[in-house]
C-alpha cells in the first residue's frame, strides 16, 4: 500500500458557520451595506446631536425625551458595529431588529416634536432624526428578514464574504436529511410536495431533489479536489467495463419504461445548484451527477467496496451516509469522486471514493 493511501484524507471543507468569533475590523469593512449604512447613521446622528445642543444652549424650549432617544441611537449604532466586528450579526438578529425598532419609535417621536418648531437649529435637529428614522427603517427591513429573502440576497451579493447562510434553509435541509433516513420513497415525495406547497420551494429549486433519474454517467465537476488520485481498481473491473456499460444501458431502458407507465407527470431536475455556504452567485453544472441522488434498483449496485477509514456524514448534506472502518458497502457507478453506495442496513447515499477500496468486480446481472 502506498504512503498516500495510509494517510486519512479530508474531503470536506470547513463550514462558514464554524468561524472564530474574535474581534476583526475586516468583518466590518468587508460588508458594503454595513459600512455605508452605519456611516450614514453616524453622520445623521452628528447632525441631530449638533442641532439639539445648539437649540438647547439658546434657552429655547427643547423636548427633553429627545436626549434619551439620541443617546439610545448612539448605543444602537455602537452595538451594531461590534456585532459586525465579532461576526455575530446572525446570532443576534432578533435583538438587533427589536432594538432598532425601538430607536425608530424614539426618532419618529422626536421628529414630530421638532419638525413644526421654529428656528434653524431645531430644523437641523429634526433633519438629523428624520434621517435616522429612514436608516432605522432600512435596517428593520434587512435584519428582520431571513438571509434567504430576495432583498437580503441582493444586498449580500455585494459583500466580499458573499451571501450569508440562511438558518431557515439549513434547518429545513437537515430535517430532510433526518426524514430521508427513515421514510419510504413515497413519503419522501409527499415531504417534497409539502415544502413546495408551503412557499419555500424557491429556496430549494437549486438543490438536487430525490427524484427518478435514468442517467448512468456520473459527472463530478462540482466535487473537484475530492477525487481518489490512486484508485485501487482491479484488472477484473477494467476487463468488464464494456460488458458493464451494456448491462447498465439495458437496465436503464427497462426502468425508464416502467417509470413512464406508472407516472407520466415526473419533471426533470434543474442542472444547477447553490451550495449551502457559497455566495449564491456561482452556478455549478451538475448534469448527470444528479443520478447519484436517484432511486437506483438493486441490480445497479454491482461493486463491493471496503471502508479504509470511518466516515461521519456531514449534517448539512442530506445525501451523505456514515460508515465504519472495514465495513463492506455495495457501490454503483465508480466514475465520479463521490460514489453512490448502500450499507448492509439498507441506507443509501453518497460516499467519498478516497475513503474506500474496491474489493470485487461487476457481478452478473442475470445470474
From Swiss-Prot:
Glycosylated residue positions: 59
Gene Ontology CC terms: cell projection; cellular bud neck; plasma membrane
SMART domains registered for this protein in UniProt: SH3
Region (Disordered): 253-276
Signal peptide segment: none
Gene that this sequence comes from: SHO1
Location within or outside the cell: Cell membrane; Bud; Bud neck; Cell projection
Domain of life: Eukaryota
Gene Ontology annotations of biological process type: regulation of actin filament polymerization
Role played: Plasma membrane osmosensor that activates the high osmolarity glycerol (HOG) MAPK signaling pathway in response to high osmolarity. Detects changes in external osmolarity and activates PBS2 through the stimulation of STE11 and targets PBS2 to the plasma membrane. PBS2 activation leads to changes in glycerol production that helps to balance the intracellular and external osmotic pressures. Activates also HOG1 in response to heat stress and mediates resistance to oxidative stress. Involved in the regulation of the mating pathway. May be a receptor that feeds into the pseudohyphal growth pathway.
Membrane topology, record value: Multi-pass membrane protein
Domain SH3 positions: 300-361
Residues recorded with modification Phosphoserine: 166
Cytoplasmic topological domain residue ranges: 1-32, 87-93, 144-367
Listed name of the protein: High osmolarity signaling protein SHO1
Extent of Low complexity compositional bias: 259-272
Record keywords, A-Z: Cell membrane, Cell projection, Glycoprotein, Membrane, Phosphoprotein, SH3 domain, Stress response, Transmembrane, Transmembrane helix
Family membership noted in the UniProt record: Belongs to the SHO1 family.
Primary subcellular site in the record, as a coarse category: membrane
Coiled-coil positions: none
Subunit: Forms homooligomers. Interacts (via the SH3 domain) with PBS2. Interacts with FUS1, STE11, STE50 and RNA polymerase II.
Regions that span the bilayer: 33-53, 66-86, 94-114, 123-143
Segments on the Extracellular side according to the record's topology features: 54-65, 115-122
Amino acid at each position: 500500500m502506498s504512503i498516500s493511501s495510509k494517510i486519512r484524507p479530508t474531503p470536506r471543507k470547513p463550514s462558514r458557520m464554524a468561524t472564530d468569533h474574535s474581534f476583526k475590523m475586516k468583518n466590518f469593512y468587508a460588508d458594503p451595506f454595513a459600512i455605508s449604512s452605519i456611516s450614514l447613521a453616524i453622520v445623521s446622528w452628528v447632525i441631530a446631536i449638533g442641532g439639539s445642543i445648539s437649540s438647547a444652549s439658546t434657552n429655547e424650549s427643547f423636548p427633553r425625551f429627545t436626549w434619551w432617544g439620541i443617546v439610545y441611537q448612539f448605543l444602537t449604532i455602537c452595538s451594531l458595529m461590534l456585532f459586525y466586528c465579532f461576526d455575530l450579526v446572525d446570532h443576534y438578529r432578533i435583538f438587533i431588529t427589536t432594538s432598532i425598532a425601538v430607536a425608530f419609535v424614539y426618532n419618529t417621536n422626536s421628529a414630530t416634536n421638532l419638525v413644526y418648531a421654529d428656528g434653524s437649529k431645531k430644523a437641523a435637529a429634526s433633519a438629523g432624526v428624520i434621517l435616522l428614522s429612514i436608516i432605522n427603517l432600512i435596517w428593520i427591513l434587512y435584519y428582520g428578514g431571513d438571509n434567504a429573502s430576495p432583498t437580503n440576497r441582493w444586498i449580500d451579493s455585494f459583500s466580499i464574504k458573499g451571501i450569508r447562510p440562511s438558518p431557515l434553509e439549513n434547518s429545513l435541509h437537515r430535517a430532510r436529511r433526518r426524514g430521508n433516513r427513515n421514510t419510504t420513497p413515497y413519503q419522501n415525495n409527499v415531504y417534497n410536495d409539502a415544502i413546495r406547497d408551503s412557499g419555500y420551494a424557491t429556496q430549494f429549486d437549486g438543490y438536487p431533489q430525490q427524484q427518478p433519474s435514468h442517467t448512468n454517467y456520473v459527472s463530478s465537476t462540482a466535487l473537484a479536489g475530492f477525487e481518489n488520485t490512486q484508485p485501487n481498481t482491479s484488472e477484473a473491473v477494467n476487463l468488464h467495463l464494456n460488458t458493464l456499460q451494456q448491462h447498465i444501458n439495458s437496465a436503464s431502458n427497462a426502468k425508464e419504461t416502467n417509470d413512464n407507465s406508472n407516472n407520466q407527470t415526473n419533471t426533470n431536475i434543474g442542472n444547477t445548484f447553490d451550495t449551502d455556504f457559497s455566495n449564491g452567485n456561482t452556478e455549478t453544472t451538475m448534469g448527470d451527477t444528479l443520478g447519484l441522488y436517484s432511486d437506483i434498483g438493486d441490480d445497479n449496485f454491482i461493486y463491493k467496496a471496503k471502508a479504509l477509514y470511518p466516515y461521519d456524514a456531514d449534517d448539512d448534506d442530506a445525501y451523505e451516509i456514515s460508515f465504519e472502518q472495514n465495513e463492506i458497502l455495495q457501490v454503483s457507478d465508480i466514475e465520479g469522486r463521490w460514489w453512490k453506495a448502500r450499507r448492509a442496513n439498507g441506507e443509501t447515499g453518497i460516499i467519498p471514493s478516497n475513503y474506500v477500496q474496491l474489493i470485487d468486480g461487476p457481478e452478473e446481472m442475470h445470474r
